[in-house]
Amino acid sequence: MDKRSVRDLELRGKKVLVRVDFNVPVKGGEVTDDTRIRRALPTIRYLLQRGARVALISHLGRPKGEPDPRYRMDPVARRLEELLGEPVRKLDTATGPEVGRALEELERGVILLENSRFYPGETKNDPAFAAELAGPFDLYVNDAFGAAHRAHATTVGVAERLPAAAGFLLEQELDYLDGVLRSPERPFVAILGGAKVSDKLGVIESLLGVADRLLVGGAMCFTFLKARGLGVGASLVEDDYLGEARRLMEGAADRLVLPVDVVVAERMEEGARTRTVPVEEIPEGWMGLDIGPRTVELFRRHILQARTIFWNGPMGVFEIDAFARGTEGVARAVAESGATSVVGGGDSVAAVRKLGLEDRMSHISTGGGASLEYVEGRELPGVAVLPEREEV
């Protein structure tokens, strides 16, 4: 990574604002998945070990630019304190004199500021709000890859006002994605799932420019199958994108691999009657909700030959057990492959976790949307704003 790193900063005695991604699920006042908190710990510990005074800021959920008790950071503070093994002082604000006072009083541990999205200036990247956030600090570190595709005050505005650098997690995310996109060990197999071709058109184009094989599952495969002239029953199809799908298939030839069989049902619900049929025989009124066993085997063969794998998106309606087997089959194959594997997107990551395969993946991305935009070749505002290393 060519950006200035936290390693390049003189930290002793400095007040450092760290943008973390603590947008974690909370139920009944408890954090139910602390992965994102754990992934931020190396940067936090590094800063503390080098004598910095550290305050952390994150968004949580989607509050509408004003305080909402459901999205307070208190449960996150409690879990962070347990994981870090140091005191975490949670403030009920992100700005104002209280922040400066807390930094002056800080002897051990870290400060966690209140939810950045309690302020309307956050999502607008309001200059006055960014200046207020930056005021008490000497340095800024961005370790929130999952929010790097947002041009918000805590990802861009503050970085424009303070000497800024990337944290270890942001570095790691970019290094893995750069490795996949710029110098993959071959064969390079990309796997894409999810519902809509329209959401991933740029990603598909980008991956077809570098991957040896692109395996397409999830509901988006039905737009491709219909574009090939097949009947797809009541399956989800984006008719406006049939022309694009045809163009992509013609350009990719045999590098774009589609399902050969699918699991269909009359309704998308637990307990619905299901059938497994070849893609040429999807019944009228039935919808495809997962890839079938022959497709799992076909995808598996390609995956086991790979030396580099990028996987984003489920192969079916993963939340319903009857339509989860395709995603689980792909997860097991990726784990078995021994390839350098980068996995992103909520359902792909959930499948890996459910099967206990996290340790078998090279890198599990904390940012589904950010990783897709990066793969697509789009600039991530939270990364672009950081100075290049040679500028230091």
From Swiss-Prot:
One of its GO terms (biological process) is glycolytic process. GO terms for molecular function: ADP binding; ATP binding; phosphoglycerate kinase activity. The keyword rRNA-binding does not apply. CDD domains: Phosphoglycerate_kinase (cd00318). The keyword Transferase applies. This is Phosphoglycerate kinase. The lineage of its organism: Bacteria, Bacillati, Actinomycetota, Rubrobacteria, Rubrobacterales. Coiled coil: none annotated.
